[in-house]
């Protein structure tokens, strides 16, 4: 379970980015955090990851194996390492896998799943496309076998085919390996395909919280309706 109780946070004392956030996420629930840029979505993810401490309130995680997938993959890779080195580091650090043959077999399996060419493993992060690097970014996190996965705008650099491929892979992971799956996004179509619950943030506060089946309910918050209407155009 993940639980946030009366969490408030600001990067300075004069302005709070998040105010009195209360969220409970039971095991097995996939949650989307929806809102415009600057509403506090990424800050909320950083708090759950433990990158920041709340100014007020408490955060409880029943599982410590939490990993993020961020929007900009270039900042997630060592620029001087090949893709292969970065992927194998995850296998060693998170799974204790040192056998090179076993590492190679796992990488080949995942390359096939993500529809990526093995020749790309010898490249530096700067030598592959943004979409390819983002898929490697997702692959590396899944190789680490986290129990909680937090994805922050991970499809922003992907074309529609690669996007659907990654979504299918993540959906399969939520069934087999993940206790919790949190998706930060402004893209409603991505959330509709990945989560079963949506929490809407506006100006650092939760204004709506509902099951995905209730997205078009007449009782939705006016801001949620505004987001839905904007996406439909």
From Swiss-Prot:
Short name of any one Pfam family annotated for the protein: ABC_tran
Family per record: Belongs to the ABC transporter superfamily.
Name by which UniProt lists this protein: Nickel import system ATP-binding protein NikE
Residues holding ATP: 35-42
MF (Gene Ontology): ABC-type nickel transporter activity; ATP binding; ATP hydrolysis activity
Subunit structure: The complex is composed of two ATP-binding proteins (NikD and NikE), two transmembrane proteins (NikB and NikC) and a solute-binding protein (NikA).
Residue span, ABC transporter domain: 2-228
């Amino acid at each position: 379970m993940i639980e946030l109780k009366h969490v408030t946070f600001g990067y300075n004392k004069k302005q709070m980015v998040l105010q009195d956030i209360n969220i409970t996420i039971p095991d097995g629930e996939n949650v989307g955090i929806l809102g415009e840029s600057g509403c506090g979505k990424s800050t909320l993810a950083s708090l759950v990851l433990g990158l920041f401490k709340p100014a007020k309130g408490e955060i409880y995680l029943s599982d410590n194996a939490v990993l993020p997938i961020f929007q900009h993959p270039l900042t997630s890779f060592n620029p001087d390492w090949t893709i292969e080195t970065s992927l194998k580091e995850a296998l060693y650090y998170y799974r204790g896998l040192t056998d090179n043959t076993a590492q190679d077999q796992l990488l080949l399996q995942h390359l096939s799943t993500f529809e990526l060419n093995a020749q790309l493993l010898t490249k530096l992060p700067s030598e592959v496309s943004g979409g390819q690097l983002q898929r490697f970014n997702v692959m590396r996190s899944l190789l680490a076998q986290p129990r909680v996965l937090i994805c922050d705008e991970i499809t922003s650099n992907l074309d529609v085919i690669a996007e659907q491929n990654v979504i299918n892979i993540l959906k399969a992971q939520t069934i087999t390996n993940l206790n919790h799956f949190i998706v930060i996004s402004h893209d409603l179509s991505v959330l509709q395909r990945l989560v079963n619950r949506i929490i809407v943030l506006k100006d650092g506060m939760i204004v709506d919280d509902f099951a995905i089946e209730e997205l078009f309910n007449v009782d939705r918050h006016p801001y949620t309706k505004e987001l839905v209407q904007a996406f439909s155009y």
